[in-house]
Amino acid sequence: MTDDQKRELGKQAYAKAMKYELDYGCCPQCVLATVQETVGIVDDQTVKASHGLSGGGGLVGEGVCGALSGGLLALSAKYGRDRNNLDKGRYMNNFKKAKELTERFRAEFGGVTCRELQQQFTGRTFDMWNAAEYKAFDGARGNKCAHATGTVTQWVVEML
């Protein structure tokens, strides 16, 4: 696939992932489902397993943004170490790809944790386990989380 074809596929993936996030939520699943449908390297079990990573992990905000987590999982689906190769080295190429994605994400969005992005996107953080706070977050963020989800998906598709 040429670089131009990858960029075009990335743009399509951006739009699909953004729509999924706006329609369904759960940013890591939206990234992975779109990567699965676009380039086919992610299986259903990985999409399912990513569910708990949303909202920085368990909706607590302290961990890595779910969209970034989904992107890292997608890269690892292609470049990561298989179970039967645990004793075969560190697979540094995967770490390099993951580092590249993480650094690009931080530069674009001003942080990597869900809370950092909440602060960047809305000027404050929220308790997503409090119904009123979650509703306030959902309104305040607009399409910014969906944009982050689409952006990560686009980058990952272009990196694969």
Model features per residue range: what roles?
Residues 15-22, 54-63, 136-141:
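A short glycine/serine-rich beta->alpha loop
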